[in-house]
């Protein structure tokens, strides 16, 4: 919802002085677009991160944290909320080394007791005594949590693990890009190849040259492994019932009936 508001012709001139707080969450927001919002409307943004299995805010990024002098925070989901204990765990359910990415796991009074009538799923969700969120994250030096990506959205290409969120953040910084989703698609050589699906801002046209610019931007920022092998320009990206980019539906467009299980 915020992106169309930012792109509205009156976004920079309309009187929004009565709007004191704008909560956002549910899916990652482009740091570039968030910065654009703060520049236009001020520090009215407040982010909450959570999930249905722990139905309150696990972390929060306060309005004051949306500081234009500290742009790295715009990629963060904030610090843990009171009474919430978070840990970044590896596949062995042990804490990962400081500075590394791991699955965000939680212990707190707000955590569910389990899935009704689904003992196996409940056991898996609470492996090691923690609720596993399915999100991969890392902490920065100031204790702000950064969500790297959904664990199930990770792309394995040529034996390397690639997180789409990191690529999306680079591509969304391009002035022509309104929205982007990155998925893995079938590739005979690499198993999976990185594909970027892009919605352009009004006034910009799709071209091979623009696709090349986006690929080069990712290569320079993240490396050749992360650089998309292809870029598709589209009018819309499928959304879930909650309004999130539906990557399962997006992947299915490219995988079809192939053997790979679409998460």
Can you name each region flagged by the protein language model?
Residues 6-72, 85, 92-95:
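Gly/Ser/Thr-rich phosphate-binding loop
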Residues 10, 18, 83, 176-179, ...:
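Glycine-centered tight turns that cap/initiate beta-strands
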Residues 26, 50, 78, 135, ...:
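Active-site glycine-centered loops adjacent to acidic/histidine catalytic or metal-binding residues
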Residues 46-55, 78-80, 183-186, 232:
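Beta-strand->loop->alpha-helix junctions that form or flank phosphate-binding loops
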Residues 79-83, 92-124, 162:
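Conserved ATP/PPi-binding loop(s) of AMP-dependent carboxylate-activating enzymes
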Residues 93, 234-254:
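Flexible lysine-rich "adenylation lid" loop at the C-terminal edge of ANL adenylation domains
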Residues 108, 113-114, 121-124, 136-226, ...:
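AMP-binding/adenylate-forming catalytic core of the ANL superfamily
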Residues 252-263:
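Acidic/polar alpha-helix N-cap and adjacent early helical turns
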């Amino acid at each position: 919802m915020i992106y169309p508001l930012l792109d509205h012709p009156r976004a920079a001139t309309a009187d929004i002085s009565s709007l004191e707080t704008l909560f956002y969450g549910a899916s990652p927001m482009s740091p570039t677009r968030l910065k654009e919002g703060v520049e236009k409307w001020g520090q009215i943004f407040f982010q909450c991160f959570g999930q249905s299995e722990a139905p309150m805010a696990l972390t929060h990024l306060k309005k004051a944290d949306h500081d234009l002098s500290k742009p790295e925070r715009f990629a963060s989901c904030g610090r843990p909320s009171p009474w919430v204990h978070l840990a970044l765990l590896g596949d062995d359910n042990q804490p990962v080394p400081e500075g590394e990415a791991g699955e965000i796991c939680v212990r707190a009074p707000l955590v569910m007791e389990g899935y009704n009538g689904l003992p196996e799923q409940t056991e898996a969700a609470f492996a090691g005594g923690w609720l596993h969120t399915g999100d991969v994250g890392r902490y920065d030096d100031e204790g702000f949590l950064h969500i790297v990506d959904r664990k199930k959205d990770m792309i394995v290409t040529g034996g390397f693990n690639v997180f789409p969120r990191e690529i999306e953040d680079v591509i969304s910084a391009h002035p022509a890009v309104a929205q982007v989703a990155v998925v893995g698609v079938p590739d005979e050589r690499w198993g999976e190849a990185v594909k970027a699906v892009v919605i352009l801002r009004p006034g910009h046209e799709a071209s091979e040259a623009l696709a090349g610019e986006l690929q080069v931007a990712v290569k320079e920022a993240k490396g050749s492994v992360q650089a998309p092998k292809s870029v598709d320009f589209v009018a819309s990206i499928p959304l879930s019932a909650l309004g999130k980019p539906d990557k399962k539906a997006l992947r299915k467009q490219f995988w079809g009936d192939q053997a790979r299980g679409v998460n």
